[in-house]
Amino acid sequence: MNEEKRGLCMNIRYLKNVLRKARKIDDTIQLSLNSAKWEYPEGKVHETQEERCQNVKKKLFEGWLSRDQFLKECQTIVRSQLDQDRNTSKSPLKSQQQLPSSSTTQVSERLDPYAKEVQVQLSPPEEVQIVLQSELSVEQIIRDQTWEVLTNACPGMFKDWRDTYKD
């Protein structure tokens, strides 16, 4: 994997920023469906509703495929980093080490009743892995909502996106 991709995947802020930008098509789907009616210069044939819906669906699926590939590559990078950490470290990973809160900053029990509990420290790759799992769940929610907008604008044209996306 190239270092640029690795840097994007291992930095949570960059990772979320890439996904935010890649989700623009989903965020603007209603605008895409509506504006297609008004963008044609005079004399040019307007596309039919079916053509417009198919074009939006095509762009949507291209974006989804691109995000799927990016997330899979990031998962591979994180897994390899976790494996590398496990192989190079003879001691357990940070997540397996439990640190008593007395070694950290003291917090009033009134402010945080769990301050005296044992805290778990995650390594950076483990944090990224958790974020990736969360982003995969977010993807499903976004796709459900986007597909609902598309099927409302294009009634009777499409099945469930999970069936259609596989085709």
Curated annotation (Swiss-Prot):
Coiled-coil regions listed: none
Swiss-Prot/TrEMBL GO biological process terms: protein import into mitochondrial matrix
Family, similarity comment: Belongs to the MIX23 family.
Name under which the protein is recorded: Protein MIX23
GO cellular component assignments: mitochondrial intermembrane space; mitochondrion
Lineage: Eukaryota, Fungi, Dikarya, Ascomycota, Taphrinomycotina
Compositional bias annotation for Low complexity: 89-106
Ranges where the record places region Disordered: 81-108
Listed Pfam families: MIX23 (PF09774)
